[in-house]
From Swiss-Prot:
Thiolesterase that catalyzes the hydrolysis of S-D-lactoyl-glutathione to form glutathione and D-lactic acid. This is Hydroxyacylglutathione hydrolase. Residues 224-245 are annotated as: Disordered. Zn(2+) 1 binds at H56, H58, H112, D133. It catalyses: an S-(2-hydroxyacyl)glutathione + H2O = a 2-hydroxy carboxylate + glutathione + H(+). Pfam families: HAGH_C, Lactamase_B. It comes from Pseudomonas savastanoi pv. phaseolicola (strain 1448A / Race 6) (Pseudomonas syringae pv. phaseolicola (strain 1448A / Race 6)). Its EC number is 3.1.2.6. The keyword Phosphoprotein does not apply.
Length: 259
């Protein structure tokens, strides 16, 4: 049985830890800092870190890799198109890998960075997606390297996964993302309900993740570029007609950058 835990790091990062109760092995996703992981291992001395999964090269996702590799000899898997410290396995689109007995498929999702990847585990009841900084709860990552067209295509690809897919993204940005989503769609009751719920959770110091794809399709403006209300608001912000969904996305992303 696999349990998934969020290890907080820095101001708003989550390092996801997968714990295999049967084998007493574990894996982590995007350890920007080694300390939370080493602390967990100290508290669970019977567990061995076997794998480190990396979605992209930003330091808040890879900063702890070298120290963890040295301490545990864990296997490091990350995107082939980016420079990843201590990487053992270079991954490209459609690659398959097995971690703690779970098979994951690699999805290339350029936009936030050009080589960004996501890890998807297909399951009949609870599929899993570790989306890094591509798809957030109610939002998406900034475009540091890619184009709006690339990021929109990446999000559209992820949107084709099953609605039951659990979304494990790397940051606690949900509250600010929902406030932006409400500015885009002030009459969307799903957004209003989710915002109230997340406000309550955060006031109780609870995390807002994981999300799920069905909820994202109802409340994430970056997955709703087909919606008339979203396009109209994007047109209003850009003072013109956005003639494609990627143009609507670009308008929304530019607005969010200054929100």
């Amino acid at each position: 049985m696999i349990q998934i835990h969020a290890l907080p790091a820095f101001n708003d990062n989550y390092i996801w830890l997968l714990q295999d109760l049967s084998s007493q092995q574990c894996a982590v996703v995007d350890p920007g800092d080694a300390k939370p992981v080493l602390g967990w291992l100290t508290e669970h001395p019977d567990y061995r870190l076997t794998d480190i999964l990396i979605t992209h090269h930003h330091n808040d996702h890879v900063g702890g890799v070298a120290e963890l590799k040295q301490a545990t000899r864990a296997r490091v898997l990350g995107p082939a198109a980016e420079t990843i410290p201590a990487r053992d396995v270079a991954l490209v689109d459609h690659d398959r890998l097995t971690v703690l007995g779970l098979e994951f498929v690699v999805h290339a999702v350029p936009g936030h960075t050009l080589g960004h990847i996501a890890f998807y585990h297909e399951d009949a009841t609870t599929p899993l997606l570790f989306s890094g900084d591509t798809l957030f709860a109610a939002g998406c990552g900034r475009l540091f390297e890619g184009t709006p067209e690339q990021m929109h295509d990446s999000l559209e690809r992820l949107a084709k996964l099953p609605d039951s897919t659990l979304i494990y993204c790397a940051h606690e940005y949900t509250l600010s993302n929902l406030r932006f989503a409400q500015a885009v769609e002030p009459d969307n009751q799903d957004i209003a309900q989710r915002l109230a719920e997340v406000i309550r959770w955060r006031s109780e110091n609870r995390i807002s993740l994981p999300s799920n794809l069905a909820l994202e399709k109802r409340t994430n403006p970056f997955l709703r570029t087909r919606e008339t209300s979203v396009k109209e608001k994007a047109d209003e912000r850009s003072s013109g007609q956005n003639t494609s969904q990627s143009a609507v996305f670009a308008s929304l992303r530019a607005w969010k950058d200054k929100f």
